[in-house]
Design a protein with these regions (language model features):
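Zn-dependent metallo-beta-lactamase
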Residues: 242-297
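Bacterial N-terminal signal peptides
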Residues: 10-21
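Gly/Pro-enriched, hydrophobic low-complexity segments
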Residues: 170-261, 419-424, 431-432, 437-438, ...
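Conserved beta-strand hairpin/beta-sheet module of binuclear metal-dependent hydrolase folds
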Residues: 275-319, 418-437
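Divalent-metal (often Zn2+) His-rich catalytic cores of metallo-beta-lactamase-fold enzymes
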Residues: 456-488
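N-terminal mature ectodomain segment of secretory-pathway/periplasmic proteins
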Residues: 37-40, 44-131, 159-167, 309
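Flexible, processing/modification-adjacent segments and terminal tails
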Residues: 27-36, 107-186, 192, 203-210, ...
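Active-site metal-binding motif and surrounding structural segment of the metallo-beta-lactamase
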Residues: 310-355, 461-467
Length: 488
């Protein structure tokens, strides 16, 4: 019998007895024992703050080129700062593309740096020294504070964890399970060296519902001050690889930690600024992503349900004020990327049919029928049956007076199911994630942006008579200004 099994043999017997009704309090007591041993080994007990740096690759979760398929690979560097005492986290992240196809906000060439942070129930980014409130990130960032070797020990001790045992190959692992209410569920697998080998968690996703995240830790080293930390980290999200990192530096209990919630982020609320583009057509702006409301004879069409419940609910509320008495019957989705589809469940809860390219239908059918138990959202609470309509490369919806068209952007680099929305009567084009006009006084670049080339080629191929562009990101502008950016 190895040392670990000698130490936990009594615990294993106790765990076996749970089958016959061992009280939950006994399971919690035994879990506390294995957690305290891991805490002593890893230096978690007196660890208040942690800074670590790592580099490797990331894959853009929720940003595939094809719905449900491979995620876009990135080159990735991170310095993560965690404040366990104040439940705060700040990531200084630098990303660049390792391949051109797929989503994410990184440019086709060069790097992008930003800070991604959360403190309590407030999240924000810092881009070029500017604060960008982002409460949609709270649900994904709060778990990051605790779903790491030291954090999971602290969270498990606080949340009355229970203990079971599994054998994997020739290894015996203690499995500590607990729930952080409304945030995540977790299982921490602890080996005979009292190290956290992996954490299996379920976190809430606006698109996927209960989303599994598995993080593996290996090659622990002593980084000083009695703190051990893994040298390698691998993470998968919803069954797809999302991180492979090598840790280069760890600073336990550093005096450099001061994560302060900016006032602009603390006071942020989702608001919608509506503007009339034509009779019965409104731009719904006020955030990072726009939506559009289109009035039909006896119903309303909404273009784009982005981000998460709170944003899309604000859009719904504003739409009802602008177009009273006409239900939102259709929600047109430009593509599957999480930031553009995070509110489709909210619209489905409203009773709208989700309209998307046929290549996305199976993906949305699975996603929107998944359980949503960790943090029940509007869709879960509504208990509505979701209707997803997959359409071909061209789709026309009309009431006899106004027509709304959807067109596939063929050969798009961003996503192969990317749709544009066109209103022929108004000569208005709605597009997502394509470039806009050049800054005032700027000259067209010698090498055109491939996104821009493909965008204009598609408009020309379809022979769309476009006067005005209403982008999902940014302000409306003349299409002539887009063509000027290409030198036309």
């Amino acid at each position: 019998m190895n040392k670990f099994n000698q130490r936990v043999s009594v615990l294993a017997v106790a765990a076996t007895f749970t089958i016959f009704g061992l009280p939950a309090v006994a399971q919690q007591y035994e879990a506390a024992g294995i957690l305290k041993r891991a805490a002593n080994n890893l230096g978690a007990s007196d660890l208040n703050t942690l800074i670590y740096s790592a580099a490797g690759n990331a894959w853009g979760a929720g940003q595939p080129y094809t719905a449900g398929k491979a995620l876009p690979k990135q080159n990735y560097r991170i310095t993560r700062t965690i404040d366990y005492v104040n439940s705060a986290l700040s990531d200084d992240v630098t990303r660049s593309r390792a391949e051109p196809r797929g989503g994410t906000a990184e440019p086709l060439t060069g790097e992008r740096n930003l800070i991604e942070a959360v403190g309590g129930n407030v999240a924000w980014n810092v881009v070029n020294m500017n604060i960008a409130p982002g409460n949609r990130y709270v649900a994904e960032r709060v778990p990051l504070i605790w779903l790491n070797p030291h954090g999971v020990i602290k969270a498990a001790l606080k949340n009355n964890a229970t203990l079971t045992f599994v054998t994997e190959g020739k290894k015996s692992l203690g499995v500590v399970s607990f729930t952080e209410p409304g945030r995540f569920t977790a299982k921490a697998y602890i080996n005979d060296a009292a190290e956290v080998e992996r954490i299996e968690a379920v976190v809430p996703s606006p698109v996927l519902g209960d989303m599994p995240v598995v993080t593996r830790y290996s090659e622990y080293r002593d980084f000083g001050r009695g703190v051990k930390f893994p040298s390698r980290i691998e993470e998968s999200t919803a069954g797809q690889m999302t991180l492979q990192l090598v840790v280069t530096d760890v600073q336990p209990n550093s005096g450099k930690v001061a994560i302060v919630v900016p006032p602009a982020a603390a006071s942020f609320k989702e608001t919608v600024a509506s503007s009339k583009l034509a009779d019965g057509v409104w731009m719904l702006a006020g955030g990072s992503h726009n939506s559009l409301a289109i009035e039909m004879k006896d119903h309303t069409v909404l273009v784009e349900a982005p981000l998460y419940d709170a944003r899309s609910q604000a859009v719904i509320d504003e739409t009802k004020k602008l177009i009273p008495g006409k239900p939102i019957r259709f929600a047109l989705n430009t593509h599957v990327h999480f930031d553009h589809s995070g509110g489709v469940g909210t619209l489905a809860a409203e009773g709208a049919t989700i309209v998307t390219h046929q290549s996305n239908k199976a993906y949305f059918d699975r996603a929107l029928s998944a359980k949503r138990t960790v943090s029940p959202d509007a869709l879960a609470k509504s208990k509505k049956k979701v209707v997803v309509r997959g359409v071909g490369d061209k789709f026309v919806h009309t009431d006899g007076n106004r027509s709304v068209e959807m067109h596939l952007m063929k050969d798009a680099i961003h996503n192969d199911g990317l749709m544009m929305v066109y209103l022929p009567k108004e000569k208005l084009l709605i597009q997502a994630d394509m470039p806009g006009p050049l800054p005032a006084g700027a000259k067209p670049p010698a090498k055109p942006n491939p996104y821009l080339v493909n965008y204009i080629q598609n408009v020309d191929r379809l022979k769309l008579a476009v006067d005005t562009v209403a982008p999902i990101h940014g302000a409306t502008h003349p299409f002539a200004e887009v063509k000027r950016a290409l030198g036309n």
